[in-house]
Curated annotation (Swiss-Prot):
Major subcellular site: nucleus
InterPro entries the record matches: Matrin/U1-C_Znf_C2H2, Matrin/U1-like-C_Znf_C2H2, U1-CZ_Znf_C2H2, U1_snRNP-C, Znf_C2H2_sf
Protein's recorded name: U1 small nuclear ribonucleoprotein C
Biased composition (Basic residues): 166-182
GO terms of molecular function: mRNA binding; pre-mRNA 5'-splice site binding; U1 snRNA binding; zinc ion binding
Length: 182
């Protein structure tokens, strides 16, 4: 029977069958060897690419810094027409409170900006609805009719609740008594 060599583990398996290879490939040592192999291959590939770039002149020979084009030396220009993007961080927004431009540093330190006054007369505050005399009489008529229906409903639900309680209570006692006797 032919034997099988695992390239990652450098181990000869007892015989070349699908079940033996499957069991070996599921093993912890084999999985670790496969991971080590591919990380080593990736590191070698990255080192090779760095050496190719260095030899092609992408890196400067003198100090080893990147030779980038001059376009990256300055920040990009702000596009005024593109209003969907937020402004760059170095632009101060218009609603920031600052000292007036004519003040010197000493006066600017003592300058405390005042918050704008808010006019509350146009705003409507939440208030409870006001009732009138006619609506008061309607409310009293409704309130007089409500307790009668509520009492009937309350008595009916109370009796139903008592019936339910007594049924379940007796059933529970019976089942408990059966359990104790048995």
């Amino acid at each position: 029977m032919p034997r099988y060599l695992c390239d990652y583990c450098q181990v000869w398996l007892t015989h070349d069958s699908q079940s033996v290879r499957k069991a070996h490939n599921a093993g912890r040592a084999h999985i670790q060897n496969v991971q080590d192999y591919y990380t080593k291959v990736a590191q070698e590939e990255a080192q090779k690419q760095l050496e190719e770039r260095a030899s092609s002149g992408f890196l400067k020979k003198g100090n080893g810094s990147l030779d980038l084009p001059y376009a990256y030396a300055f920040p990009p220009k702000y596009n005024v027409f593109n209003l969907g993007c937020p402004p760059p961080p170095y632009i101060v927004s218009a609603n920031t409170y600052m000292a007036p431009k004519g003040m010197n540093a000493m006066n600017a330190a003592a300058f405390v900006p005042m918050m704008p006054a808010v006019n509350l007369t146009n705003q409507v505050a939440f208030s409870a609805p006001q009732t009138t005399a006619s609506s008061n009489t309607q409310l009293t008529q409704q309130q007089q009719s409500l307790p009668q229906t509520n009492e009937h409903q309350r008595a009916r639900t109370h009796s139903n609740a008592n019936n339910h309680f007594t049924k379940t209570h007796h059933q529970g006692q019976r089942s408990h008594q059966r359990f104790v006797r048995a």
